[in-house]
Amino acid sequence: MAAVLNAERLEVSVDGLTLSPDPEERPGAEGAPLLPPPLPPPSPPGSGRGPGASGEQPEPGEAAAGGAAEEARRLEQRWGFGLEELYGLALRFFKEKDGKAFHPTYEEKLKLVALHKQVLMGPYNPDTCPEVGFFDVLGNDRRREWAALGNMSKEDAMVEFVKLLNRCCHLFSTYVASHKIEKEEQEKKRKEEEERRRREEEERERLQKEEEKRRREEEERLRREEEERRRIEEERLRLEQQKQQIMAALNSQTAVQFQQYAAQQYPGNYEQQQILIRQLQEQHYQQYMQQLYQVQLAQQQAALQKQQEVVVAGSSLPTSSKVNATVPSNMMSVNGQAKTHTDSSEKELEPEAAEEALENGPKESLPVIAAPSMWTRPQIKDFKEKIQQDADSVITVGRGEVVTVRVPTHEEGSYLFWEFATDNYDIGFGVYFEWTDSPNTAVSVHVSESSDDDEEEEENIGCEEKAKKNANKPLLDEIVPVYRRDCHEEVYAGSHQYPGRGVYLLKFDNSYSLWRSKSVYYRVYYTR
């Protein structure tokens, strides 16, 4: 504490607070004594002035404490700050604005300093406070004002400090309001920042969950794809193994004939022979699988038809049907004559059937016919140029005609081979085997009209004559059904193992074409 005493001004600085008397109370005024008035005797505890500017006595005991708490709540509701925070604002305003924004009186400054001491150090205690000199007027005034507060609590002192400062300067309310706005703005920003962080955290958690979900879905998709790929690979290996087994079985049956055919096509060229053999084996396998699928489809259709006809399953079959049922299923007979002749009178045909069985043997004794092998090759131009050198190997099939090339089996042969091609258009082709012992081994060509003409001729004769005529015809088995072949694009070839002695019938069917004749380049030969 520092004190300055002169004729014009008296100032006291306590803890950063400057106290100076009002001009009208300066010691240099006219008639005023040069020395300060003597200090009054100390009043007993509790007999000092109250904390208010009007000198009201404080409320004793618990009533005073309760009143201070209630006053603190009212201040907080009014100013928007807690008591501690509001007192801090008031103290800072007093230190910053004293002598600038407002000019409190000498007594008001003494009271404000005393209240600040009461808040900071508690009630005045003469035993702990140092003595003040007799001539220290301001020190004595300050101590007297502090002692007058008595046992005022810290909260009451802060309340009185705020209320007194508000009475001294009307700018204090504006100062607090600006800080309140700033506080609210900071609180708003804090809440916005917390909300932003909360949203960012939620968004981050959501993205993490989505990423985890996508990762799990991707892992599941990869797992399913891997399982599917493994299953497909296993299926491919199984089919490949099955294919190798089937091809090995088929190749063991056709090795000799394919080798002979390749040797004839490329004599002395082993590499080309092996390439051709592999092509023939692959085509033979594809043809075998196609026939196998057709047989399975036919079996399924037959089973379905059998289920549909279960209502008539109890009807008895004719004797002729029972005989025909014993024929092996892999022998597809197209001997329509034999079928027609069984549908006729049974008594009338018994002697002829017995005679046929004595001469040719029973039908069931016929050997099983092996499946044919068929393939194609693209060298159609070279093939036709080679065939044109032999005029007998080029035949013309007129429009609506069917040309049959009869090729008897050879005593020294085991397999029959055929090759054919056309110029610009396709043609029907099929192979049949006629069970007849022909003494002539020469190849012959027979031209006939459409097969419909033969059927019309058979319809014009009686049943008895037709039965006799059909009975005299030899048995006929279908080796390759007649289908239209794209032989104008590539060479069609095939082979078949002799089922026995007989005649092969190679049919070139142009009955469907009413306007064009077809030139056929063909070649047939046998191998052992």
Curated annotation (Swiss-Prot):
Residues 384-526 form the GOLD domain. One of its GO terms (cellular component) is Golgi membrane. PROSITE patterns: ACB_1, ACB_2, GOLD. Residues 241-308 are annotated as: Q domain. Changing residue 253 to A: No effect on PI4KB- and TBC1D22B-binding. One of its GO terms (molecular function) is fatty-acyl-CoA binding. The modification Phosphothreonine is found at residue 18. Ubiquitous, with highest expression in testis and ovary. Residues 514-516 are annotated as: Membrane-binding. The modification N-acetylalanine is found at residue 2. InterPro entries: Acyl-CoA-binding_prot_CS (IPR022408), Acyl-CoA-binding_protein (IPR000582), Acyl-CoA-binding_sf (IPR035984), FERM/acyl-CoA-bd_prot_sf (IPR014352), GOLD_dom (IPR009038), GOLD_dom_sf (IPR036598), Golgi-PI4KB_interaction (IPR052269). Residues 1-71, 182-230, 335-362 are annotated as: Disordered. Residues 83-174 form the ACB domain. One of its GO terms (biological process) is steroid biosynthetic process. Changing residue 246 to A: Partial loss of PI4KB- and TBC1D22B-binding. It is found in: Golgi apparatus membrane; Mitochondrion. It is a peripheral membrane protein. Changing residue 258 to A: Differential effect on PI4KB- and TBC1D22B-binding, with PI4KB-binding being much more affected than TBC1D22B-binding. Residues 340-350 have a biased composition (Basic and acidic residues). Keywords: Acetylation, Coiled coil, Golgi apparatus, Host-virus interaction, Lipid biosynthesis, Lipid metabolism, Membrane, Mitochondrion, Phosphoprotein, Steroid biosynthesis. Pfam families: ACBP, GOLD_2. Homodimer. Interacts with the C-terminal cytoplasmic domain of giantin/GOLGB1. Interacts with PBR and PKA regulatory subunit RI-alpha. Does not interact with PKA regulatory subunit RI-beta nor PKA regulatory subunit RII-alpha. Interacts (via Q domain) with PI4KB (via N-terminus). Interacts (via Q domain) with TBC1D22A and TBC1D22B; interactions with PI4KB and with TBC1D22A and TBC1D22B are mutually exclusive. Interacts with C10ORF76 and RAB11B. The central Gln-rich region (Q domain) is involved in binding to PI4KB, TBC1D22A and TBC1D22B. The C-terminal GOLD domain is essential for giantin binding. The GOLD domain is also involved in homodimerization. (Microbial infection) The GOLD domain is involved in binding to the picornaviral protein 3A. PANTHER family: GOLGI RESIDENT PROTEIN GCP60 (PTHR22973:SF11), LD35087P (PTHR22973). This is Golgi resident protein GCP60.
